């Protein structure tokens, strides 16, 4: 063929063929519901069987009456239409009916869960996360948006930590082996905490994290584990064995490290409280010292006053004693003076006594005198010289 067609021409041609097909304009399809999501008032999901998958959409809110949920088998009536912007065909649904049987994915998940419960995998006590980790082991794909989200979040919050990437595929045939190797390697490392993460995806995309071997490997990790797989509505089995399960990769990174800015603010608040406490202590001590000084001063003054009073009393007693002694001495002196006065030779001479002297010496007896001796006779009012006959 020589004619060359544009993408739009091919798409519109296929769309016309499907629109003209009477079988596809009113068709009923049976399959297992997967990856059911509400968006802008519409319901998007997939119907799948063992071999293939078809996209489905309920426009408007009519779907709410049908009780659709992931893992259930549904019989859906509608029309096959082409979604030209993506070049995809899908089932535009009008009605749906839930069938009593369960889907294979649901049954597989139920069986795995029951086996893991029997092993006690989900009963493991949660370990505390390190408050200030220095090394983080990150298990994810190096090409994923989740990897960039974790790096950016940790860099913004706590750039002091080292991040060691353990690259793994997160979907596809080789993903399980790749993830098991990453878990083995991180278990032999000296990291402080492990983050296992990937971005959102369909239930099939996230099935890897429900795999029993993966769950057991996570259970055996020596280090505390944080999971951040999918989005807020997604829960997988490794979330149940993790020490902390976050809704998103960003939330997992936030759980792994503290916020350095908040630490600084907390430190400043502590410093302010400590300074205030120190000031209050100093003021209290100053008041105590001032009170002690006043008390000491008052005590010293009281002691000084008591001492002064005691000294005054002692002085009075000493003065009285001195007065008594002086009076006694005066009496004794007066008595002695009287005696001395009475013994004064002059006083005796006045009474008529005479002192006889010879050669300047007192004559105490007449026997020592000889005739013609010159003697002196001392009266109270003068001396007379005489010759002995």
Curated annotation (Swiss-Prot):
Name assigned to this protein: Exodeoxyribonuclease 7 large subunit
InterPro entries per UniProt: Exonuc_VII_L, Exonuc_VII_lsu_C, OB-fold_nuc-bd_dom
Claim: Nuclease is one of the keywords in the record: yes
Role noted for this protein: Bidirectionally degrades single-stranded DNA into large acid-insoluble oligonucleotides, which are then degraded further into small acid-soluble oligonucleotides.
EC number: 3.1.11.6
NCBIfam families reported for this sequence: xseA
Signal peptide range: none
Transmembrane feature ranges: none
Keyword flag Ligase: no
Entry GO terms, CC: cytoplasm; exodeoxyribonuclease VII complex
Keywords: Cytoplasm, Exonuclease, Hydrolase, Nuclease
Catalytic activity: Exonucleolytic cleavage in either 5'- to 3'- or 3'- to 5'-direction to yield nucleoside 5'-phosphates
GO molecular function terms attached to this record: exodeoxyribonuclease VII activity; nucleic acid binding
Any one of the GO BP annotations: DNA catabolic process
Gene behind this protein: xseA
Pfam families tied to this protein: Exonuc_VII_L, tRNA_anti_2
Known partners and oligomeric status: Heterooligomer composed of large and small subunits.
Superkingdom of origin: Bacteria
Family indicated by similarity: Belongs to the XseA family.
